[in-house]
A protein has these predicted regions:
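Beta-rich, blade/repeat-based domains predominating
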Residues: 1-3, 39-54, 87-107, 141-154
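Loop/turn-rich, solvent-exposed surfaces of beta-rich toroidal or solenoidal domains
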Residues: 96-160
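Acidic, glycine-rich loop-and-beta core segments that form the ion-binding/anion-interacting portion
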Residues: 38-89
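A short beta-strand motif characteristic of beta-propeller blades
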Residues: 32-38, 83-92, 133-139
Length: 178
C-alpha cells in the first residue's frame, strides 16, 4: 500500500519551486502535507521518482539541471536532502532543461532526460546509502527528450518531442549503459 505522494511545483509565479510530501489517508481519500523542500530560486523542481524501498526519493530540477537525492522517513513523512548532482556534463555551456527522472526497474540506477542538450544522464545508486554516482551521459538520438519509460522487455523508450520520435534503447542493468 502506497501512503505518500511527492508533488513538485516549479514555482514560476513566485520563483520558489518546491517538492511536497503528502500523506494519503486511505479511508477518507484526503492528502495532508507532512514536509516541504524549497529549491533555490528559479531551479524549478520538475519530477520526483521514488526508489522501490520507499526510503529514497530522487528529484530533477528543470532549470537548475540537477538531480537531488533525499532520504525519506515514511513513518514521519519527512525527507532530508543529502546530495545534488548536475544532469549535464560540465562542458555544457548552452541552455538545457532537465525533464524527467526515473528509477530503473532493477532499482540500481536513476536516469534523467535533458532537453536541448538532447541527452540522458545515468547514475548508479549505492545499494546501502542511496547516494548517486554518475555513469555517463548518452545522446537520446532525437531532439528534445521529454519523457521516457521502461518496457517489460527491459528496454528504455525515449519520447523526443521536437523530432516526433520514440527511440528504443537497450539498457544494461548491470553497467547502466544505454
Amino acid at each position: 500500500k502506497k501512503n505518500f505522494l511527492f508533488a513538485c511545483a516549479q514555482g514560476r509565479v513566485n520563483g520558489y519551486g518546491q517538492m511536497r510530501a503528502l500523506r494519503y489517508d486511505h479511508e477518507t481519500g484526503e492528502f495532508t502535507q507532512t514536509d516541504r523542500f524549497l529549491s533555490r530560486t528559479w531551479d524549478e523542481p520538475r519530477h520526483a521518482a521514488v526508489h522501490p524501498n520507499n526510503r529514497w526519493v530522487y528529484m530533477c530540477e528543470e532549470k537548475g539541471n540537477k538531480v537531488l537525492y533525499f532520504r525519506f522517513d515514511d513513518e514521519k513523512g519527512t525527507f532530508e536532502a543529502l546530495q545534488e548532482l548536475t544532469t549535464v556534463p560540465e562542458t555544457v555551456t548552452g541552455y538545457s532543461d532537465a525533464s524527467e527522472v526515473m528509477v530503473d526497474p532493477s532499482g540500481k540506477f536513476v536516469l534523467v532526460s535533458n532537453r536541448y542538450t538532447d541527452s540522458i544522464a545515468v547514475y548508479r545508486i549505492d545499494p546501502v546509502t542511496g547516494y548517486l554516482r554518475n555513469v555517463g551521459f548518452y545522446p537520446c538520438l532525437g531532439k528534445t527528450p521529454r519523457f521516457f519509460c521502461f518496457g517489460d522487455n527491459g528496454k528504455c523508450y525515449v519520447a523526443n518531442e521536437d523530432s516526433d520520435t520514440i527511440v528504443e534503447f537497450d539498457f544494461d542493468n548491470v553497467t547502466g549503459t544505454l
